[in-house]
């Protein structure tokens, strides 16, 4: 029997790298409101950790009785399970980090079921943008001092500066050198004040050891590929067509693989997808073979070059954890009709996972 945990604050916990990390309010709220979602992929009778069992069952019923098959369990109950039984044989969080391991230890989880400190450190390293820059990406550099940062920005004219670890929509700055024009991309303003970005980056360097400097792409559409590492092999699970607002995730298209490929076919020759996938697997599989087991994803991007030709960046981000793209794939398997939208919405008080028929509008395209 498996224990599933939704810890969406994982990316921020990696950045903090502290045993007693407390996420910002928004992260804690998202954790609380969507704690039930592992029920979408858990096996029958698996445990799913939540704070409020009645609330979790109520939410899962709204997604269909097919998901009403798991055992929701509170932290207090989990502590008793660890203390008195051997019911749980493996733990499957959204992502592994020091804060989660410390929490599980406090609940009495046997250490043999948890990653070691050395393994956690390795997972954190591979999860960081520096590792991706050095192993998976092209034309991305990692700088560790202010002078190198200024030179990198001036050399590019316009650039994207990122913290090594951060959640979606955070830890990312769009910047232009004094010699470049200030303009916007996808609603994100290129920082008119270079010095603001420099000060921010210097602070990040002190906390996380450096920042990445990447090309400023004229983005046309986001998409991704979802994988699972199992028994030392990378298995491809499917495409993810997702939507972001100012870099923060808002939703996914639920559709068959053929339908998703049809969407992408409007932008580039999708025969190249297989080659991109094979190249990424060839690079990642040897590294993860003895390090990681579970889901992960790679965010990609369609962009236009200066001549207007559409190209593909095959690795914008490596997410060494479960992703909302995986959730969309699991939900999509159960949908009787295609072209549904899965959205994470905030009503000012709580977060909601909604699934609705339809397709992206022209005003709000689903990337």
Language-model region placement:
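ATP-grasp fold ATP-binding core
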Residues: 153-176, 201-219, 298, 317
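Glycine-rich phosphate-binding loop of ATP-grasp-fold ATP-dependent ligases
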Residues: 140, 159-197, 224, 246-264
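Conserved N-proximal alpha/beta basic substrate-recognition cap immediately N-terminal to
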Residues: 28-41, 49-154, 167
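ATP-dependent carboxylate/phosphate-activation module, predominantly the ATP-grasp catalytic core
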Residues: 227-282, 319-343
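Phosphate-binding site of ATP-dependent enzymes
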Residues: 191-250, 302-305, 309-315
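A long amphipathic alpha-helix within ATP-dependent nucleotide-binding catalytic cores
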Residues: 206-210, 236, 249-310, 353-365
């Amino acid at each position: 029997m498996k224990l599933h945990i939704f810890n969406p604050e994982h990316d921020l916990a990696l950045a903090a790298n502290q045993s007693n990390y407390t996420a910002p309010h928004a992260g804690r709220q998202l954790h609380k409101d969507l704690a039930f979602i592992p029920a979408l992929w858990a096996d029958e009778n698996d445990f799913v950790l939540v704070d409020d069992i009645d609330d979790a069952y109520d939410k899962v019923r709204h997604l269909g009785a097919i998901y009403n098959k798991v055992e929701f369990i509170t932290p207090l109950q989990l502590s008793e399970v660890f203390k008195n039984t051997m019911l749980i044989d493996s733990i499957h969080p959204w992502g592994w980090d020091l804060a989660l391991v410390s929490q599980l230890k406090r609940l009495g989880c046997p250490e043999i079921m948890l990653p070691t400190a050395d393994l956690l450190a390795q997972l954190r390293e591979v999860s960081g943008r520096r590792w991706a820059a050095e192993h998976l990406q092209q034309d991305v550099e990692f700088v560790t001092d202010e002078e190198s940062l200024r030179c990198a920005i001036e050399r590019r004219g316009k650039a994207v500066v990122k913290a090594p670890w951060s959640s979606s929509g955070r830890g990312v700055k769009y910047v232009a050198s004094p010699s470049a024009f200030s303009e916007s991309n996808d609603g994100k303003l290129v920082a008119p004040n270079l010095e603001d970005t420099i000060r921010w980056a210097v602070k990040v360097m002190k906390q996380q050891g450096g920042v990445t400097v990447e090309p400023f792409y004229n983005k046309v559409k986001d998409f991704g590929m979802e994988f699972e590492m199992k028994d030392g092999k990378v298995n491809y699970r499917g495409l993810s067509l997702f939507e972001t607002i100012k870099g923060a995730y808002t939703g996914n298209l639920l559709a068959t693989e053929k339908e998703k490929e049809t969407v992408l076919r409007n932008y580039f020759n999708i025969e190249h997808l297989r080659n991109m996938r094979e190249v990424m697997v060839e690079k990642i599989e040897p590294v993860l073979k003895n390090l990681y087991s579970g889901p992960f994803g790679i965010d990609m991007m369609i962009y236009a070059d200066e001549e207007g030709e559409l190209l593909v960046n095959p690795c914008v981000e490596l997410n060494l954890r479960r992703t909302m793209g995986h959730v969309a794939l699991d939900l999509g398997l159960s949908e009787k009709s295609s072209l549904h939208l899965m959205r994470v919405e905030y009503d000012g008080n709580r977060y909601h996972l909604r699934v609705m028929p339809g397709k992206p509008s022209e005003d709000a395209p689903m990337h």
